[in-house]
Amino acid sequence: MGTKYKFLNPSGIYFISFAVVDWIDVFTRNKYKDIIVESLRYCFEKKGMVLFAWCIMTSHVHLIFGVKGNIKHSDLIRDFKKFTSKAIINAIIHNTQESRKEWMLEKFVKARTNKTNISGYQFWQHDNLPIEVFTPSVIACSKIL
């Protein structure tokens, strides 16, 4: 198994990018962006995320982050993506003013077709493409949160 896109350094600081399936522009609505922001805040305050920079684009998210404590980078991102996926899809389902609701939900169902490990909807693409960017001592002075 290759190591090109893995979190190899437990104390490393990584740039990752993860996108909505089919690059759907979900984050044009503040309601859905707020779920990402609140989830990042929770990960920072409760789960050991050290967040240096983040950017929410219309269809994807960029993070520069590390971890403290016993949590692994991959476990943190797995949990973040799992929670935000469910929360955003639930928000879409219950948003009576979402004009793209049926179209988006259909895309999320189609994205999980033929994938045995996913039931319901697939919101995020599977890859994160982590790239270790700096050592902790280099970036410590520019921490955002």
Regions found by a protein language model. Give the residues of each.
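Short catalytic/metal-binding and nucleic-acid-binding patches
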Residues: 1-145
